[in-house]
Amino acid sequence: MAWAAPAAVGVGVWLGLAWAAGRRRRRMARARRRGRRGEERAIRLLRDRGYRVIARQVTGSVEVFVDGRRGTHAVYADALVRRGWRRYIVEIKTGASASVAHRGTRRQLLEYACTFRCCGVLLVDADRGRISRIGFRVLS
């Protein structure tokens, strides 16, 4: 019976780890569902505001040079839309990251501005129903 206590601890640890892994999976699945619903709301909002969706899940490429060696990297955007003769690349966000105050969002939008040949970048806040046209100017 000396083995019973360590075995019980082992089973308890295993159950705790399994519970935590299941919780992470459920949280990620919930985030994916929220993202899909937000994307659908954002696409409807863009259409309602007069934008025509040309493509969804757009892929662009950028060359990065490190010490003279070239590397090509893919850049993924949520949509490419047109309004009149102007084309825009679109990033759709939900929650707190839907603001340019969020550093990751700002960097992502700047990457789009450098990668895609469009008239501008649109940030769509799916939760608030807001479309913002984003522009950049270097100050230093």
Predicted segments with their positions:
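Interdomain/boundary linker segments immediately adjacent to catalytic/signaling cores
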Residues: 1-45
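Short, flexible active-site-adjacent loop segments at beta-strand->alpha-helix junctions, enriched
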Residues: 20-21, 85, 127
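Surface-exposed cleft-lining segments at the edges of enzyme active sites
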Residues: 25-29, 67-68, 96-97
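Active-site metal-binding core of divalent-cation-utilizing nuclease and nuclease-like domains
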Residues: 31-35, 45, 52-87
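Amphipathic coiled-coil/heptad-repeat helices and related helical stalk/stem segments
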Residues: 39, 72, 105-108
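Nucleic-acid nuclease catalytic cores
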Residues: 82, 93-140
